């Protein structure tokens, strides 16, 4: 007899391509039936068969304070009673912009949009408009949304599907995008020496969360900052994932790097669709209505999403919030690593703030190439063993995981116990 999840997936595929509204949700990489979620609270969510899971995707990052936090829910309810959307400015937008600028000092001015893709796309257009140049640099395996010029050897879902690029991206778009190796400062410097005067910007994830978890090295970021300044290119940090996730000031505060522009999302919406891009005021002044770079959005600064974001940003400013979040994430990855050693499984893990990566390899990957050598078959087996035990990990070997403030010791201990059994099962399967 099929489960309710099976029935819903079959039904969804009749009206929605692949049965999902974002590819990774289809479980194509790991196999099996996607779980259709009915509710979530704290560190848990429940599927259509009323099965509870410890959630380690957290809506792919936004649920940093846990699902359905009472303060966030109340803020949304209160805002909704005053109107869902106005298409006109509100005081709440100003307050959110002021708070972002205060928490992220490199951002002097900021504009709110509705998605990370929109924010990254707009930041690129702004950089091109401000510099009068066309070429951009991105890095293999990094994902900055699905805008055409950025789907060139992109990470995330495209890695999951084994495609280096997306169909439908014209050659004329791609030719202006230079794709370099992540964490290779020498290559970056050489490219600038060859064509620095034609490069508008460099965009990078300081903590790449779309080829599992791969932090940038200090030398890589420092070289990037230096050559961008030297050649007049705009340095863009894509902190859609790491912003307010790894530290209150984002990854840039951890690494001591000051970008020209920053892209934010996920956490700043508290679970609702909102993103932002901002940075130096002299660059931001190129945006319409002040300058010639056009950007607009019907739902930009939506009052309900802003309310959810402001409530979340207030909660994460609590004393000790990030220390506790980091400690719990560290406890999780150390526990998983110890369990793998007990089973003699080649495995390692890493974390930054509330983000973590799991690698079926003997050493933590430091580049796209080493990441691609991780054992995806073993990851898939581990994923399903954990899923059967009620622990929901990212359904792809190329996606980072997320811990929330509601993942207490009991939740972490339960997850480690499940991992110990899963690794033992993998070891038994190898012996057979």
Swiss-Prot record:
CDD domains: OAT_like. SUPFAM superfamilies: PLP-dependent transferases (SSF53383). Pfam families: Aminotran_3. It catalyses: (S)-4-amino-5-oxopentanoate = 5-aminolevulinate. Its main location: cytoplasm. GO terms for molecular function: glutamate-1-semialdehyde 2,1-aminomutase activity; pyridoxal phosphate binding; transaminase activity. Its cofactor is pyridoxal 5'-phosphate. Pathway: Porphyrin-containing compound metabolism; protoporphyrin-IX biosynthesis; 5-aminolevulinate from L-glutamyl-tRNA(Glu): step 2/2. It is found in: Cytoplasm. One of its GO terms (cellular component) is cytoplasm. Its EC number is 5.4.3.8. GO terms for biological process: protoporphyrinogen IX biosynthetic process. Keywords: Cytoplasm, Isomerase, Porphyrin biosynthesis, Pyridoxal phosphate. The modification N6-(pyridoxal phosphate)lysine is found at residue 266. Belongs to the class-III pyridoxal-phosphate-dependent aminotransferase family. HemL subfamily. Homodimer. This is Glutamate-1-semialdehyde 2,1-aminomutase. It comes from Janthinobacterium sp. (strain Marseille).
